[in-house]
C-alpha cells in the first residue's frame, strides 16, 4: 500500500460506514448506537485509482486518561501518528459540536495533512452543517454520503490534493506478481496412495482468540505484539469488533483476530452485543486455529464448554489457553485438576492441547504458539489411502462391525476425502445401519493410531457399489 489514512471523528458521524465503503466489505460493525467502534481497525482500501491502507478509529470525546473513553482517545491518537493523512469526518446533517472543534484543534497541532469529510450531505438540511465545516480551519470540506457512495470521486481528488501526486502515486516496484491462495488445502488432489504431503510452514496462519468476557483475550494479543495495540481494562465487554492484527513469529506471519466476549445466549439481549457475537462467529469460521481463552481462576464454566463445542462443530482446530496463571496460588494442584477436567468434560476433543499462560506477564506464550502450530499441522494432516485401508482391516479384526437385523455390516474401503479438518469416507454395506457407537470407535482409533489429538474428525459412510448390479440391469 502506498500510504496510510486514519478516519477520525466524534461518535456516530459515519466513520465505520465510510471505512466499509472504502474497503469494499462490511468489516466494521455499524449501528445507530454511538461508540460502536473502540479499537483501531486496519484495512486495505481502494478509491478509484488510489490504493492505500486505512484505519478505522473510535469516536472521540474528551475524558480522563484512565477511563475507557480516555484509553480509546489514546488509541486514536496512535492511529493519527501512524497515518500519513487523516479523514476528519463530521456530520453535515447534525452540524458541528464542541467535540468537533476539540478534534480539529488536536489535528492542527499534529501538523499532518487533513481532509474534512462532511458526511450525510445527501440529507435535507445538511447545507448548514457543510458550510459550518469551513470554520474548522482545516480547508475546504468534501461533501459525501458514505451510506450511498456519493461524493467518492471528490474524496479521491481531495486526498490526492492533500498528499500530493508523488505520495499518492509512488513509483511501482519492479516485483513479479504472484497469485497466492491464502487457503490452500494441504495435499488436496494427491493421487499417490502412499504419499503424505508435507506441512507448509511458510503460509500465513489465521488464529482467532475467543472466550468469555474479561478472560484476557486483548491483553494476550497485546503481549504477543509487544505494544498496547488493543483496548484493555477491568470493564467486561470492551472489545466489540473482531479486530485483526499481523505479527511475525519465528519467521512465520501470524494473523490474529481479537473477538468480543461470548456470553450465554440468554444473557445477550442488546442488538449491539448480538452483532458483536455474530462478528466473533465469522472470525471463528475464517480462522484456521482457534484459541479458547479460559480464566484460570474460574475455569470450565458452562459457557467455556459451549464455546469449545461451537469451535469444534465449526470444524476448526482448537487450543485451550488457561490465562491469568500469575493469579493462581497452588498451581501444581490446579494443573492436575485442569488436565483431569479437560479429558472428562471434552471427550469430543480428546488430546486437545491446553497451555497455562499469563497475558499480563508473558508466561507460557512461546508454549502456546508452539501448541497452535502443532495443532494446525494436525488439522492439515492427510493420510495415504494405503495406510488407511490397512488400518481399517486391522480395526475390523480387533472389533468386527456389529450385525444389524441378523446381517453383519462390511466395511470395504476407506479414503481421506479432505483435510482442515480431517474427513474420511468409508464404503460399506448399508451405511444407514452403522451404529453411532461404532463410528465413535473408529474416530477414537483414528485419533490414537494416526496422532490426531484435539481436532474434529469427520467419518462418513456410503454404500459400496455392487459390480454385478449393472450387469444384471443390462441383461434385463
UniProtKB/Swiss-Prot annotation:
Please list the residue ranges annotated as the EngA-type G domain. Answer: 3-167, 205-380
Q: Name one GO molecular function term.
A: GTP binding
Q: Which residues bind GTP 1?
A: 9-16, 56-60, 119-122
A Pfam family annotated for this chain is: KH_dom-like
Q: Where would I find the KH-like domain in this sequence?
A: 381-465
Transmembrane residue ranges: none
Which UniProt key words apply to this protein?
A: GTP-binding, Nucleotide-binding, Plasmid, Repeat, Ribosome biogenesis
CDD domains xrefs: EngA1, EngA2
Which InterPro entries does its entry note? G_ENGA, GTP-bd, GTPase_Der, KH_dom-like, KH_dom-like_a/b, P-loop_NTPase, Small_GTP-bd
Which residues hold GTP 2?
211-218, 258-262, 323-326
List the PROSITE patterns hit by this protein, alphabetically: G_ENGA
Q: List the disulfide bonds.
A: none
The record's Gene Ontology biological-process terms are:
ribosome biogenesis
**Cross-referenced SUPFAM superfamilies:** P-loop containing nucleoside triphosphate hydrolases (SSF52540)
Q: How does it assemble?
A: Associates with the 50S ribosomal subunit.
Q: Which family does it belong to?
A: Belongs to the TRAFAC class TrmE-Era-EngA-EngB-Septin-like GTPase superfamily. EngA (Der) GTPase family.
Question: What does this gene product do?
Answer: GTPase that plays an essential role in the late steps of ribosome biogenesis.
User: Any idea what this protein is called?
Assistant: GTPase Der
The organism of origin for this protein: Rhizobium meliloti (strain 1021)
Q: Which gene encodes it?
A: der
Amino acid at each position: 500500500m502506498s500510504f496510510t489514512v486514519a478516519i477520525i471523528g466524534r461518535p456516530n458521524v459515519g466513520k465505520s460506514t465510510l471505512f466499509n465503503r472504502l474497503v469494499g466489505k462490511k468489516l466494521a460493525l455499524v449501528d445507530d448506537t454511538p461508540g460502536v467502534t473502540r479499537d483501531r481497525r486496519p484495512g486495505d482500501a481502494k478509491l478509484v485509482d488510489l490504493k492505500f491502507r486505512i484505519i478505522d478509529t473510535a469516536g472521540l470525546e474528551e475524558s480522563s486518561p484512565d477511563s475507557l473513553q480516555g484509553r480509546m482517545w489514546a488509541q486514536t491518537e496512535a492511529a493519527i501518528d501512524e497515518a500519513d493523512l487523516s479523514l476528519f469526518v463530521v456530520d453535515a446533517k447534525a452540524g458541528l459540536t464542541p467535540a468537533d472543534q476539540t478534534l480539529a484543534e488536536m489535528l492542527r497541532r499534529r501538523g499532518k495533512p487533513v481532509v474534512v469529510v462532511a458526511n450525510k450531505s445527501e440529507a435535507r438540511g445538511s447545507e448548514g452543517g457543510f458550510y459550518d465545516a469551513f470554520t474548522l480551519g482545516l480547508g475546504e470540506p468534501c461533501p459525501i454520503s458514505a451510506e450511498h457512495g456519493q461524493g467518492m470521486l471528490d474524496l479521491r481528488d481531495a486526498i490526492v490534493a492533500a498528499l500530493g501526486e508523488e505520495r499518492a502515486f509512488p513509483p511501482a516496484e519492479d516485483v513479479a506478481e504472484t497469485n497466492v491462495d491464502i487457503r490452500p488445502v494441504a495435499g488436496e488432489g494427491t493421487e499417490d496412495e502412499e504419499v503424505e504431503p508435507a506441512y507448509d510452514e511458510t503460509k500465513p496462519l489465521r488464529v482467532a482468540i475467543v472466550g468469555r468476557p474479561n478472560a484476557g483475550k486483548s491483553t494476550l494479543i497485546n503481549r504477543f505484539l509487544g505494544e498496547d495495540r488493543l483496548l484493555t481494562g477491568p470493564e467486561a465487554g470492551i472489545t466489540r469488533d473482531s479486530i485483526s492484527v499481523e505479527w511475525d513469529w519465528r519467521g512465520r506471519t501470524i494473523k490474529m483476530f481479537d473477538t468480543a466476549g461470548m456470553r450465554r445466549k440468554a444473557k445477550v439481549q442488546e442488538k449491539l452485543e448480538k452483532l458483536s457475537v455474530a462478528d466473533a462467529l465469522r472470525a471463528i469460521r475464517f480462522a484456521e486455529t482457534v484459541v479458547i481463552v479460559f480464566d484460570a481462576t474460574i475455569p470450565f464454566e458452562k459457557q467455556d464448554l459451549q464455546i469449545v463445542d461451537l469451535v469444534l462443530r465449526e470444524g476448526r482446530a482448537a487450543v485451550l489457553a488457561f490465562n491469568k496463571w500469575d493469579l493462581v496460588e497452588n498451581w501444581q494442584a490446579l494443573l492436575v485438576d485442569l488436565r483431569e477436567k479437560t479429558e472428562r468434560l471434552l471427550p469430543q476433543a480428546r488430546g486437545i492441547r491446553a497451555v497455562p499462560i499469563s497475558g499480563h506477564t508473558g508466561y507460557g506464550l512461546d508454549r502456546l504458539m508452539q501448541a497452535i502450530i502443532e495443532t494446525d499441522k494436525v488439522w492439515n494432516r492427510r493420510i495415504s489411502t494405503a495406510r488407511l485401508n490397512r488400518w481399517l482391516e486391522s480395526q475390523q479384526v480387533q472389533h468386527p462391525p456389529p450385525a444389524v437385523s441378523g446381517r453383519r455390516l462390511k466395511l470395504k474401503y476407506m479414503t481421506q476425502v479432505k483435510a482442515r479438518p480431517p474427513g474420511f469416507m468409508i464404503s460399506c454395506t448399508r451405511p444407514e445401519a452403522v451404529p453411532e457407537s461404532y463410528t465413535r470407535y473408529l474416530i477414537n482409533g483414528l485419533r490414537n493410531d494416526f496422532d490426531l489429538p484435539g481436532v474434529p474428525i469427520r467419518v462418513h459412510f456410503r454404500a459400496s457399489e455392487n459390480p454385478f448390479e449393472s450387469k444384471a440391469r443390462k441383461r434385463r
